[in-house]
């Protein structure tokens, strides 16, 4: 067998075979047939030991040259077939079709409401203050006129870490911290998370609250009423009716709870012929608590209650969101149901 002639014949033979390969799979079959472990080149080289020792180097060098030529032919044909495949795919592409829109996220409804509330009070000249969620007993209770054993502490199911360290039950401690660091006039709101040991259809262990307060000379209940009425009508609409009811909070005196006309039934107490489940036919829903800052609180922060007066108020952000958007179950805010959350996109 003339091995040199056999080797030289492989190149034109492969060129004819590659011309018939119309897909990458057929091309791979040709590559295996010529360059595989049992391919044509390997079969020819299997006769190399039969040659005289002096001829083997010349045949081996020729085999390497042929192998390189075969490999180049395969690569060239592969490029051609890949380009043809890509062109075929592009020929089916219709640029006039609408594209696939990327998934769009949105802010959480609680975040939306909190930002709206902060925006309203920001326009009224209030600063935004923040502080620790892990609080001490003094700032959370004692400085707010709730000494140890005070019955008002029972109103809040507190999560204690140690005997004197706890998860804050309201954002009112920021009122104390801010007044300690600033001299009047002071006007600020304190948004943030608060924690209580409670969980049902209207309560969660963690929720969001905003505390607001103003301190200056001759601040009155009339200013409190005007501020909150303006705020509530901005958030819920200009036709919203607002009423103040006497109440009790240990850190304000006098104290009041604020109701607004029901957003669901429009203050009528019924929806069609059915009683309103939100306001329970009264036409009113409670929205926040407020009052004039107690003189004992002023004393704890070094303000002279004979010189300064001020008001404070607090509201739950989730409650505002529930009323604003007509949501019946507080827990829906925290269940991460995309079908629910995407409504606010």
Curated annotation (Swiss-Prot):
Location of the protein in the cell: Cytoplasm
EC class (word): ligase
Biological processes, Gene Ontology terms: phenylalanyl-tRNA aminoacylation
Protein keywords: Aminoacyl-tRNA synthetase, ATP-binding, Cytoplasm, Ligase, Magnesium, Metal-binding, Nucleotide-binding, Protein biosynthesis
Catalytic activity: tRNA(Phe) + L-phenylalanine + ATP = L-phenylalanyl-tRNA(Phe) + AMP + diphosphate + H(+)
Cofactor binding note from Swiss-Prot or TrEMBL: Binds 2 magnesium ions per tetramer.
UniProt GO cellular component terms: cytoplasm
Pfam families according to UniProt: Phe_tRNA-synt_N, tRNA-synt_2d
Superkingdom field: Bacteria
Location (main, coarse): cytoplasm
CDD domains on file: PheRS_alpha_core
Cofactor(s) this protein cannot do without: Mg(2+)
Molecular function via GO: ATP binding; magnesium ion binding; phenylalanine-tRNA ligase activity; tRNA binding
Listed EC numbers: 6.1.1.20
PROSITE patterns in UniProt: AA_TRNA_LIGASE_II
InterPro entries on file: aa-tRNA-synth_II, aa-tRNA-synth_II/BPL/LPL, Phe-tRNA-synth_IIc_asu, Phe-tRNA_ligase_II_N, Phe_tRNA_ligase_alpha1_bac, Phenylalanyl-tRNA_Synthase, tRNA-bd_arm
Family membership: Belongs to the class-II aminoacyl-tRNA synthetase family. Phe-tRNA synthetase alpha subunit type 1 subfamily.
Subunit structure: Tetramer of two alpha and two beta subunits.
Record's protein name: Phenylalanine--tRNA ligase alpha subunit
Annotated source species: Nitratidesulfovibrio vulgaris (strain ATCC 29579 / DSM 644 / CCUG 34227 / NCIMB 8303 / VKM B-1760 / Hildenborough)
Native organism taxonomy: Bacteria, Pseudomonadati, Thermodesulfobacteriota, Desulfovibrionia, Desulfovibrionales
Gene responsible for this protein: pheS
């Amino acid at each position: 067998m003339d091995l040199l002639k056999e080797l030289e014949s492989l190149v034109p033979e492969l060129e004819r075979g590659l011309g018939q390969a119309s897909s990458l799979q057929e091309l791979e079959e040709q590559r295996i047939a010529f360059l595989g472990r049992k391919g044509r080149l390997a079969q020819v080289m299997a006769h190399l030991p039969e040659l005289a020792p002096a001829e083997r180097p010349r045949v081996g060098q020729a085999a390497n040259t042929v192998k390189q030529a075969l490999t180049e032919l395969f690569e060239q044909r592969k490029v051609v077939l890949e380009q043809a495949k890509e062109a075929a795919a592009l020929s089916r592409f219709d640029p006039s079709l609408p594209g696939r829109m990327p998934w769009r996220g949105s802010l959480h409804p609680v975040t939306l409401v909190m930002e709206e509330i902060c925006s309203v009070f920001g326009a009224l000249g209030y600063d935004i203050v923040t502080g620790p969620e892990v609080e001490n007993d003094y700032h959370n209770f004692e400085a707010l006129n709730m000494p140890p054993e005070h019955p008002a502490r029972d109103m809040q199911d507190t999560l204690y870490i140690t005997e004197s360290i706890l998860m804050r039950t309201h954002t009112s401690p920021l009122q104390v911290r801010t007044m300690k660091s600033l001299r009047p006039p002071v006007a600020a709101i304190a948004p943030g998370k608060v924690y209580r040991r409670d969980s049902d259809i209207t309560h969660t262990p963690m929720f969001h609250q905003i505390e607001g307060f103003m301190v200056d000379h001759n601040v009155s209940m009339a200013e409190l009423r005007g501020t909150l009425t303006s705020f509530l009508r901005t958030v819920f609409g200009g036709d919203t009716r607002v009423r103040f009811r006497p109440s009790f909070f240990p850190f304000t005196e006098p104290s009041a709870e604020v109701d607004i006309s029901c957003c669901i039934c429009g203050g009528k107490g019924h929806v069609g012929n059915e009683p309103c489940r939100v306001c329970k036919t009264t036409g009113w829903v409670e929205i926040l608590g407020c009052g004039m800052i107690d003189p004992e609180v002023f004393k704890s922060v070094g303000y002279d209650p004979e010189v300064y007066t001020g008001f404070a108020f607090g509201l739950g952000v989730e409650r505002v969101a529930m009323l604003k958007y007509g949501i019946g179950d507080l827990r829906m805010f925290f269940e991460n149901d995309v079908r629910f959350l995407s409504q606010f996109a």
